[in-house]
Regions:
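Vicinal oxygen chelate
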Residues: 1-14, 36-87, 94-122, 133-134
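Conserved beta-strand-loop-alpha-helix junction that forms the acyl-donor binding cleft
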Residues: 19-22
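Charged catalytic carboxylate motif
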Residues: 24, 91
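Conserved active-site tyrosine of GNAT-family acetyltransferases
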Residues: 25-30, 99, 126
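Short glycine-/small-residue motifs
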Residues: 128-131
Length: 134
């Protein structure tokens, strides 16, 4: 087998998020974040495009031949975070107001840390997002 260069500019990184209820997740990503649904696969997965990035929403599932001994599960406890998404914005307070009006569930209003103003919110399954103005 021949080697291929890696990475190359024509590659793309896709984040997989496991969700408990696909319709609720799609509503959140479309209606709250303004993401575009790119493609759906039989009701248990959905590709969305957000800020030039790909996010694959999938429902829970067990091991497969290409990922043995691996379970896909939504966050069990949203208070324990292993990853989060940061959205860099020019106006944190303005984006906070817009997202809050659309239904985003913020942990607190924006906090000014001097060099950065930021606020955190979760999707319906507890995946953590941050809006950050630096």
């Amino acid at each position: 087998m021949e080697k291929s260069p890696f990475p190359t500019e024509d590659m793309a990184l896709t984040t997989i998020l496991v969700v408990s209820e696909m319709s609720r997740a799609k509503d959140f990503y479309q209606d709250v974040l303004g993401a575009e649904i790119y493609r759906e696969y039989g009701g248990d997965s959905c590709v969305i495009r957000f800020l030039g990035n790909w996010i694959l929403l999938v429902t829970a599932g067990g091991p497969t031949d290409d990922k043995p001994d691996t379970q896909f599960v939504p966050p069990l406890n949203p208070e324990n975070v292993s990853h989060s998404f940061t959205i860099r914005v020019k106006d944190c307070m303005g984006c906070y107001e817009t997202l809050k009006e659309r239904g985003a569930d913020f942990l607190t209003p924006p906090v000014d840390w001097g060099a950065e103003i930021r606020a955190f919110f979760r999707d319906p399954d507890g995946h953590l997002f941050e809006i950050s103005q630096a």
